[in-house]
Amino acid sequence: MTQTALNIGTTLNKTKNDVELRKVFKVFEGHTAVKGVDFNIRQGEFFSILGPSGCGKTTTLRLIAGFETPSAGEIIIRGQSMSQTPAYRRPVNTVFQSYALFNHLSVKDNIAFGLRIKRLGKTETEEKVAQALQLVKMEKFADRYPNQISGGQQQRVALARALVNRPAVLLLDEPLGALDLKLRKQMQMELSNIHKDLGVTFVMVTHDQQEAMSMSDRIAVMHEGRIEQIGSPQEIYECPESPFVADFIGDTNLFQGCVEYNNNSSLVVKTDSGLNISAEYKKVNGKNGEIYGGTSVVLSVRPEKVNLSLYPPDVSENCFEGRLRNVMYMGTHVHYQVNLLSGDQMMVRQPNTERTLPNLDTPMYVYWSKQNCLALSESKS
C-alpha cells in the first residue's frame, strides 16, 4: 500500500519537525513525573521513547496527545502550539496497548467509527475503510467482531482505525505489549513496513529495548523523568552517554574504577576490584571528551566484544583469567558467564560455531581491545 492510498502523507520534509517539546514538566500531587523534557521529532520519523516502568514515558505521550496538560513548558505540533488545543482537536491519533476496540461493532465498523463521527459521506467512508483494511491485510475479516479475531488481528484493526483518520502523527502506547514473542516480532516488521509505506510520523512508547531498536529511526532513552540520550539505535548502543543507557540498552559488563592516567589516545583505569583496564581515550561518554587522572568512571564492555580462550592469548592489554561459571546455549549463539580471579563476573556472547561446549569450572581467559571499552562518567554531565 502506498502513501497515497489513504491520502495521509504530503511530500515529506525530514528537515522539518512534526512535534516539538520545549522544557516540558508534569507534576502530579507533588511528584514530578516529567522533568524538563526537550526534544524534536522530525516529519516522517519513527521515534521511540524508551525506558523502564515509571520513567515518565507514557506521561510524555499523553502530554503530546492532549490527555494531560503540562505543568510548565510547551508542546508544538506541525508548527502550532497545543497549549489551548484539546485532545480531540489535535492532529494525532493514538493506538493503545489494550486496542480499545468496540466489541459490538464489526471490524469494518470499528475502522469507520471516526469517519462517521466526522460525518463523511457513505461512499467516501467505505472507500477509506477498504483502503485501511487492505493496508493491514484484514480484508477477509471485515465482517467479523473483535472477539472472533486474534490478538495480532485486533492490533491491526486498532492501527487501521487510527490511520484511516489521516493523522499528522500516530502515537503508539506499547502497541505490541499484549502479544506473544513470535507474533510481536512479526508485528514489528509489519508496523515498520506500514510506517515506511505511508510516511506518517510515528511516536512509540515502549520498555522493550529490542522493539525500539528494530523499528526506530531515533530513540529517546528516558530515566526518572528526564531524557538521558537521543540518537539512532546504533548510536544509543555503540556510544551510550551514561552508565544507565549502557546498562539499559542490551547487555554489558560494567566496571567501576578510577583513572590512573591518560595520554590523549588511551587511558588506564584501576577498577575497584584491582584490575588495570585500558580504554580508548576518545570514547568518553560516547563522544569526544576530556577525562583526567583521579576521575571516577564506569567502564562498559559489550559481551559480544569480549573474546574467550582456553589458552593465554597473545595480547598485551585487557586479558584476565577466570573460570567458567555458566553456559547458556541459545541456538545461534552461546552466552558464557566467567568468574574472574579478581572476583568480577563477566558475560561473553559468541556465535555458535563449535559442536561441543566447554565444561563448567574450566579455566578460561577473557580479553578485549581498548577500542571496545567505553569510559563513562558516573554522573552524566
Swiss-Prot record:
EC number annotated for this UniProt entry: 7.6.2.11
Protein species of origin: Trichodesmium erythraeum (strain IMS101)
UniProt record similarity statement: Belongs to the ABC transporter superfamily. Spermidine/putrescine importer (TC 3.A.1.11.1) family.
Membrane topology: Peripheral membrane protein
One Gene Ontology cellular component: ATP-binding cassette (ABC) transporter complex
Name of the protein described by the UniProt record: Spermidine/putrescine import ATP-binding protein PotA
InterPro entries: AAA+_ATPase (IPR003593), ABC_SmlMolc_Importer (IPR050093), ABC_transporter-like_ATP-bd (IPR003439), ABC_transporter-like_CS (IPR017871), Mo/tungstate-bd_C_term_dom (IPR008995), P-loop_NTPase (IPR027417), PotA-like (IPR005893), PotA_ATP-bd (IPR017879)
Sequence positions that bind ATP: 51-58
